[in-house]
Amino acid sequence: MLQSFKLAIRSIWGNKMRSFLTMLGIIIGVAAVIILVSLVNGYMGSVVESFASMGVNQINVNVTNLSSRSLDVDQMYAFYEDHTDLFGELSPNVTVSTTIKHGDDSMTTTSVSGKSEQYLDIKGYKLEQGRNISYSDIASRQKVCVVGNYVARELYGSAEEAIGETLKVGGYAFKIVGVVEVQDEENLEEGGTDDFVWLPYSVAVKMSRNANINSYTFTVLDTSKADQCKTLIESFLYETFKNDDLYHVTAMSELLDSLNEQIAMMSGMLGGIAGISLLVAGVGVMNIMLVSVTERTREIGIRKSLGAD
């Protein structure tokens, strides 16, 4: 055994370039497999985490209200109340395109939207200061708002100092009643996750001058029943509009499943490419071994004739 090992080492040392190229082929093949698999797993993890943070228990509804057939917020809430065994929260969504101001400072890229008192729970956010929008704020159309941490810091210096202050939204004065905790400390910037203002949706509807609300967000109590909940919503909307082109219902769990399928396909393709690289490296090693045996055929014969095993 020791003699064979010494002979192998001597053979490798005597063919340095050939040995180096052989090892290089194996190293490249193995490295390709490790790197590609690691990249895919890292990408998959980050994307899935990003989608999960958006809420896999959410169902988004977008409707097109026509003059002849429309869906008002009371109808949607009545449907929601009839199925509280399946749905967790509901929030209308009203986008308001406007500028916010405080004194001489203004912000033009801030996301301004109308939400319900349940939207904070839908997003899974927590308040750093103050309180959330309440049902009474919505019912009485109070000009109050909840702001993201970036807005509070940028216009008032801190979340604590922002509470109770006045914020001009589209020329109307709103009282800041709550500041949401930081969601993305690394991207606490203009247009980021923390750059938003939430108003009572009843007030936002008046500001947007839309007669009806076109967007809603539901959460489901059991994600395994997301498909059932989606079908239920679609049936309700079809009964209202009699035309399935006038609404679109999207379950986040479906998007996540579709994404996982695409990532699995990508992982398989990259794994196949890496496997081919390793196979090519293996063929190279076999080729070198065959060449080495061919070159030493005479030496092997002489050793055999002298009694070598």
Predicted features, each with a name:
Residues 1-309:
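Bacterial inner-membrane juxtamembrane interface segments
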